[in-house]
């Protein structure tokens, strides 16, 4: 059995991808009511070609990104198609059989279960707004109500 530290299994492959969002964020809910946001990121390698003295694109890789619970709500409000992002998370692979003529073959998809998502600040600026969770909001509302009733 794999060990776990802060929710990350030690045998998981954790990776960071810097790229562009290529699909609008979709929000759905599990049967238990947990929010799940998903989007796709494309990343391309770039290298300098000394012969042409120009930067050239290499292969492009696409990753489906899944965000859970509070992060899902934040991503829905913050991430849009075309946005440069940095995504850190656990790599997941899944195989889907696809028919190909007489013989079937398997297509392998690589997904990222996000630990963190943010804008790529090498390509722009951002403004951060801390989100207050329900328990904090309730506590502040009770404090205000107590102050108003005692005045």
What do the predicted segments below correspond to?
Residues 38-56:
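Short beta-strand/loop turn elements enriched in aromatics
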Residues 90-98, 105, 111-116:
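A eukaryotic "domain-to-IDR transition" signal
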Residues 27-42, 108-111:
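Short aromatic-glycine-enriched beta-strand elements
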Residues 1-14, 29-33, 50-54, 77, ...:
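Acidic, gly/ser/pro-rich intrinsically disordered tails
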Residues 52-77:
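A beta-strand/beta-hairpin structural motif
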Residues 17-21, 41, 81-93, 114:
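OB-fold and OB-like beta-barrel modules that bind single-stranded nucleic acids
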Residues 13, 33, 59, 83, ...:
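Residue-level preference for beta-strand/loop junctions
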Residues 68-100:
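Beta-rich strand-turn-strand
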